[in-house]
Amino acid sequence: MMEKEIVITGFDLISPIGVGQEEFWTSLRDGVSGIGCLDGTTPDSAVRPFVAAAPDFHAKDFVKPRKNIKVMSRDIQLGFVAAMMAVKRAGLNVDIESPENRSVEPERLGVIFGCDLMALELSELADAFYAGMENGKYDFSKWGPNAMTKIMPLWMLKYLPNMPASHIGIAMDARGASNSPTLDRVSSLASIIEAAHIIQRGDADVMVCGGTGNRSNPCFLSRGKSYRLAPWTGDPQSVPRPFDAGRVGTVNGEGSGALVIESKQFALARGAKPLATLRGYCQAVAPTNELLNMAESVERSITGALKKAGMSIGEIDHINADGLGTVEDDAREAAGIKAAAGDTPVFTGKGHFGTLGSGTGAVELAASLIAMEKGTLPPVRNCEKVADDCPINVITKEHTVTKNAFVKINQTNMGRSTAVVIEKY
């Protein structure tokens, strides 16, 4: 049982299927896919990478002053805007100009925001690269004197993984704890857990947490084998196929999700309306270099989170799984879920938008938070026939929510599994 109750008072997201809760849920409910081909490619292109971009998101519509965008990579833009949207949803006044109206003191407000190791935009280094060319060959001796003059002095600040949390914190004058977990797909959930620890030990009243990722960048796409991507042939909207007998790989996307969490006592005192309670959490790691034991890691993260929550699996409405859509990962995750949760219904959103890197967990968690309010959860997209090596109760038809709590889990390719238990308030 958690020593101090931690509640969620606001959340929001940016995803390939919608900007904000309303667009996202409508697309999820209607079975919309956000997956297409890389911008700039045509049917005649030699290679047409599948990606899940967020075409309806334009930072200039949200970031003020706009000049700040110059030092924000796509990852930072996504994370910053999602966080500000979540803060607004929570009714949290963080006005720097009118400190007397603030909902929380700067020293009692912190930011823990997960982020990937960001990939640069190739166009930003093009001039620098060509500055070292001579007679069709690259002269490395010219990199220092010639190329560096072609790079913006603040270029590096666009790609440091701590910058999403930095920009969010500066905008709110948050002077409390700040960190940037860089843990692949578990980054968002790890951020929520760390933020909860900070509140529980009395070092903050309110924390903004979540994650952001842009895996649709060509630099990430060039490492397709490392990320077990689906082949770039056929209909891009037919993949990923989580837990399906015909699954062939995942798809890289971009997105961000953010939550405002606070102690229940503080939230009620400021007149906020709690949406859900963080009941428990657990992180587990498979033995080094033994990914076949990933199932054990998944099982231990779920059972550990339930134990901390003081709940049984019978009280859980559904498991919001990782469901990457790859042959190996899905089978291992399914084995762990089966061992820990039996026939508990299983949902994943990756059939709609692929993997969003460090933004994955918070965006997917938002789906379950909305579902708990709506009372229904749509079927897992692209899962037409549950695979024999995934013996779990995948939601293949509309699911009616009958219980007040769910478990969200994510894993990494290095054997780490993270789980949180969330209960509707």
For the regions a protein language model found, what residue spans apply to each?
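ACP-dependent fatty acid/polyketide chain-elongation machinery
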Residues: M1-N68, A90, Q265-T277, A366-R381, ...
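Condensing-enzyme catalytic core mediating Claisen C-C bond formation in acyl metabolism
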Residues: E5-T9, V32, G36-C37, D235-M311, ...
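Active-site pocket-shaping loop/turn-to-helix segments
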Residues: L13-P16, R66-M84, A128, M152-L157, ...
